[in-house]
Structures are given as structure tokens and as C-alpha cells.
């Protein structure tokens, strides 16, 4: 039977290779989401049939990610292991956030199954070149904001961030918190989690960068490469610097 253990930062190096090659194009299939939101999921993991199996707990119910294949992974055998686990524990079998191309396979595997599409929770997917160029009428608003930002801060430049102890990052969080006026507990916790993620820069699991203007960081971003998709976990910019948000989006896409 599957033996699950809690997914923590300590297990990151062990699990990151699964996510590094995972091409499901869903943010839930990333190490960053599992770490950043571990208090809400919370994720536990097991390995079977060459696959990573994640068990989350959503609103008190155990739900499973679709198996993430390793080099010799067998998704069918991993699903069988999940089925046996649920049978032994007398749990309903619930697969959550299933990749679209896997859903039809599951319908064939399970004759009596309910499929639910949660539209509000769907991810936004962009072509890299669209964000790197912001070309065409669709992105005219973003271009206008970036042009204003460039006029206001002609010295602005994108820099890669790799050191969690970079003093420029420390200064950015101080500046950001000074402009941060959200009082809700979730907003405050999200900010704390974002800072925690940047503390993991030296692990090599994530890529990060920032926009420098007038000698200081005015925007930062952190993402994770999962297969052919760059999963953007964090974007923060100083509200006082209009256009910094689309500027960091464009520069980040062009760099990574």
C-alpha cells in the first residue's frame, strides 16, 4: 500500500525532477505551488510505478493529483496503486485538477465517473512571445503602460536574481510593505509566502528576476520551469511606479 509523507522544503530536491519534466501545463503540477500553499492543500506524497503521487486535502476531503511520471513512469500502474489505497482506507477516489488530455483516459478507465469543470480555477496560458513582445491591438494597454514606465525611468533594467540574501531584495520587500495597504489575513499571508519562496533562490528550483530603476528594485518575479511551461508563481511591483507590473512581465518572458 502507498505510504505517504508530508511534502516539505526538505523533500524539494527529491521531488523537483518530477516537476521539471512535467508538461501538464497546470500550475498545481509544480513544486512551487505545493510549497507555497502547503498550509491550504496540504500535500503529502508517495512514489510508485516510477511516478510521483500527490495526496492533497481540500475542505476535509482527500483528493489526488494525476500521477506525475518519472523517466520510467507507468501512469496506469500508479492509478492502480491509488485505487488500492482508497479501497484499503475506504475513501472515495477523487482525482483533482486533471490535465485535459488525461480526462478522456480516465472516463474510459472508470465506467461510472463524474467530471466537474471548475471554470473560475482555470489557469491563464500565454505564448512566451506574446508576453515578451506585447504586439498587436490586444496588448495595446500593456504597451502604453510600459512606454510610460520607460519614459519615467529611462535607466530601468531587468536583472536576474539568484541570491536569496541579495540586499536589493531585502530593500524591495521593505519598500513594498510600506506601500502595501491590504489588511486581510489572506493577503498578508500571501505576501509572507512570497518572501519565503524568494528565500529558496539558492536551491536552483526557480528562476527569478527584478526590474531596477534609479538604483533599486521596483518589481520582482519568480517562476518555475515545468516541461515546456514557465509557471509564474509571484509578481510584485511597487504601486508608486506606474507600469512596473507589465514591464517586469515583458522582461521576464524575454529573459526566461
What name fits each language-model region?
Residues 1-20:
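Short, extreme N-terminal leader segments that mark the start of a protein/domain
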Residues 17, 28-101, 212-239:
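Conserved donor-binding loop and adjoining core beta-sheet/short helix segment
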Residues 81-85, 148, 175, 197-199, ...:
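A generic secondary-structure signal
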Residues 91-109, 120-123:
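Short, glycine/charge-rich beta-strand/loop segments that flank catalytic centers
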Residues 111-183:
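Acyltransferase donor/substrate-recognition loop-hinge adjacent to the catalytic core
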Residues 186, 191-256:
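Accessory, usually C-terminal, subdomains that scaffold auxiliary metal cofactors
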Amino acid at each position: 500500500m502507498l505510504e505517504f509523507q508530508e511534502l516539505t522544503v526538505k523533500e524539494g530536491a527529491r521531488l523537483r525532477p518530477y516537476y521539471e519534466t512535467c508538461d501538464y501545463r497546470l500550475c498545481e503540477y509544480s513544486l512551487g505551488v505545493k510549497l507555497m500553499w502547503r498550509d491550504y492543500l496540504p500535500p503529502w506524497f508517495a512514489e510508485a510505478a516510477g511516478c510521483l503521487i500527490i495526496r492533497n486535502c481540500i475542505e476535509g476531503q482527500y483528493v489526488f493529483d494525476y500521477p506525475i511520471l518519472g523517466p520510467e513512469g507507468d501512469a496506469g500502474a500508479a492509478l492502480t496503486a491509488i485505487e488500492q489505497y482508497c479501497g484499503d482506507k475506504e475513501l472515495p477516489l477523487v482525482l483533482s485538477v486533471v490535465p485535459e488530455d488525461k480526462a478522456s483516459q480516465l472516463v474510459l478507465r472508470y465506467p461510472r465517473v463524474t467530471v466537474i469543470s471548475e471554470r473560475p480555477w482555470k489557469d491563464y496560458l500565454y505564448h512566451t512571445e506574446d508576453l515578451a513582445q506585447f504586439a498587436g491591438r490586444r496588448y495595446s494597454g500593456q504597451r502604453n503602460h510600459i512606454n510610460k514606465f520607460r519614459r519615467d525611468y529611462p535607466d530601468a533594467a531587468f536583472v536576474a536574481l539568484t541570491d536569496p540574501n541579495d540586499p536589493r531584495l531585502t530593500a524591495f520587500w521593505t519598500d513594498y510593505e510600506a506601500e502595501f495597504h491590504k489588511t486581510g489575513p489572506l493577503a498578508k499571508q500571501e505576501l509572507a509566502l512570497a518572501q519565503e519562496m524568494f528565500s529558496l533562490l539558492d536551491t536552483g528550483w526557480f528562476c527569478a528576476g527584478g526590474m531596477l530603476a534609479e538604483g533599486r528594485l521596483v518589481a520582482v518575479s519568480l517562476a518555475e520551469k515545468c516541461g515546456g511551461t514557465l509557471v509564474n508563481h509571484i509578481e510584485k511591483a511597487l504601486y508608486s511606479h506606474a507600469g512596473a507590473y507589465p514591464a517586469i512581465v515583458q522582461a521576464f518572458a524575454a529573459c526566461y
